[in-house]
Amino acid sequence: MSDFRKQPLTAETVKAKALELGADLVGIASADVLNAFPPDPKYPQTPDRISPHVKSVVVIVQHIPAAVFRCKQMVPVQYMDMVILRRMDKVATKLAMWLESNGHPGFVTAAQETDWNMKRASYGYLSTRHLGIEAGLGNFGLEVNILTPEYGPRLYLTGVLTEAELEADEPMQEQVCVGEGCSRCLHACPGDAVGHFD
């Protein structure tokens, strides 16, 4: 893309646009940092694995209403998941199109994608949890989900990968999870998936 259409963009302008489009939270991660420190170096989930031109990842959060987790059946949860993922994809796509209209190409990664060649399991091209942590939106809880101060673990994340060089947010220093002294996630897990702390 030629530079004549390129408009100067700041991280604050991009984040304000994402919020205007409907994101609940937004942060920015540096592609260089994500490339240098993949969550699992053996199976690198990095932006350069997708495109060598990515400079920044705009991380978008959509929260899941807490009330849906109080339902007796899974159907409302599944329906809300579907609605929220669709909404998040629309917000991210509109942001990518807006970035491009300002001369900064960008594209969306699917929040729920799987590359079956990696680990033979549900393992996407990017770890959205790690994107959120690097973008300063939250940190890991005992159950290894991202926790945000605003929504706890009840959220979905996606990323808009862009060629725009934006100032990255700093990872949170304060822990959202208070650790084993709380252990609410351990006791609430119906499958006892995190019982290894007992």
What are these regions (language model features)?
Residues M1-M88:
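Non-catalytic, usually N-terminal nucleic-acid engagement modules in DNA/RNA processing proteins
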Residues F4, P76-D198:
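Catalytic cores of enzyme domains
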